[in-house]
C-alpha cells in the first residue's frame, strides 16, 4: 500500500466533539483569525492541508471500493469458478441448494404446462398429442435443471468470493487507521459545510428510505435478492421478522444520533429538521 504522507495534517483534522456546538466555536475561530496579522499565511497553509486531505481521502476511498471489487471478480472467475464447477459436476447429484429453488422451478414448469394447454384451447397453437406435450414439458424441465444448476454453482462462487472480498476490505481498514482518520475528518468537514436545510433534507431522505412507511417493500426485495445471491432459502417468516424489527432499531439509532450528537454540533440543523419533518 502506498505510504501516505500525513505529516502536514493539523490536529484540527482530528478534533472531537465538545460540549459547545461546533458551529459556535468555528465562528469564534474565524473571527479570531480575521484579527490575526498572520492570518494570510495560515489561510494558505490551511488550503494546502485541505487540498491534501481531500486528495488523500478520495484516493483511500477509491482504494476501499475498487480493491475488494477487483479481488471479488478475479477470485470468482479464475479461482473459485473452476473449483466449484469441478466439485459440483463430479461429486454433486443435486440440482437445488434449497427448497426455494425447487418451488420456483416447479412453479415455472407448471405455468409452462398450463400455457401450452391454454394456447391450444384458444387456437393460438395447433392441437398437440399428449406425447408431444410431454416432450415439450420434458425439454422445459431440462432447461430449468440446467438453469438452477448454474444458479446453485453461482451462489457458492458468490459466497466464497464475497468472503474473500470482505476479508480484503477489513485488512485495508485495519492497516489504514490513519487514512481512516483523515477520511473521517474529510467527511465531517463535508457534512458540516452543508447548509442546515441541506442537512435536514439528507436526514429526512435517508430516514424515509431506510425506516419510512414504504421502506418495508424495499427491505423485502433486498433480503430476497441477498438470500438468493448466496443460495440461502428465502424464508418468508425470517424476512418478515427482520422487516418488523431492524427498521425499528435503525430508527432508534437515527433518533439517538440526532439527540446525542447532531444536537451538539449543529443545533440549527436539528431545528430545521424538526420544522421540515412536521
UniProtKB/Swiss-Prot annotation:
<feature type="transmembrane region" description="Helical">
    <location>
        <begin position="239"/>
        <end position="259"/>
    </location>
</feature>
<keyword id="KW-0812">Transmembrane</keyword>
<keyword id="KW-0050">Antiport</keyword>
<dbReference type="GO" id="GO:0006813">
    <property type="term" value="P:potassium ion transport"/>
</dbReference>
<keyword id="KW-0813">Transport</keyword>
<feature type="transmembrane region" description="Helical">
    <location>
        <begin position="201"/>
        <end position="221"/>
    </location>
</feature>
<dbReference type="GO" id="GO:0015297">
    <property type="term" value="F:antiporter activity"/>
</dbReference>
<keyword id="KW-0630">Potassium</keyword>
<comment type="function">
    <text>Contributes to K(+)/H(+) antiport activity by supporting proton efflux to control proton extrusion and homeostasis in chloroplasts in a light-dependent manner to modulate photosynthesis. Prevents excessive induction of non-photochemical quenching (NPQ) under continuous-light conditions. Indirectly promotes efficient inorganic carbon uptake into chloroplasts.</text>
</comment>
<keyword id="KW-1133">Transmembrane helix</keyword>
<keyword id="KW-0150">Chloroplast</keyword>
<keyword id="KW-1001">Plastid inner membrane</keyword>
<keyword id="KW-0375">Hydrogen ion transport</keyword>
<keyword id="KW-0472">Membrane</keyword>
<keyword id="KW-0633">Potassium transport</keyword>
<comment type="similarity">
    <text>Belongs to the CemA family.</text>
</comment>
<protein>
    <recommendedName>
        <fullName>Potassium/proton antiporter CemA</fullName>
    </recommendedName>
</protein>
<dbReference type="GO" id="GO:0009706">
    <property type="term" value="C:chloroplast inner membrane"/>
</dbReference>
<feature type="transmembrane region" description="Helical">
    <location>
        <begin position="60"/>
        <end position="80"/>
    </location>
</feature>
<dbReference type="Pfam" id="PF03040">
    <property type="entry name" value="CemA"/>
</dbReference>
<keyword id="KW-0934">Plastid</keyword>
<keyword id="KW-0406">Ion transport</keyword>
<dbReference type="GO" id="GO:0015078">
    <property type="term" value="F:proton transmembrane transporter activity"/>
</dbReference>
<feature type="transmembrane region" description="Helical">
    <location>
        <begin position="155"/>
        <end position="175"/>
    </location>
</feature>
<dbReference type="InterPro" id="IPR004282">
    <property type="entry name" value="CemA"/>
</dbReference>
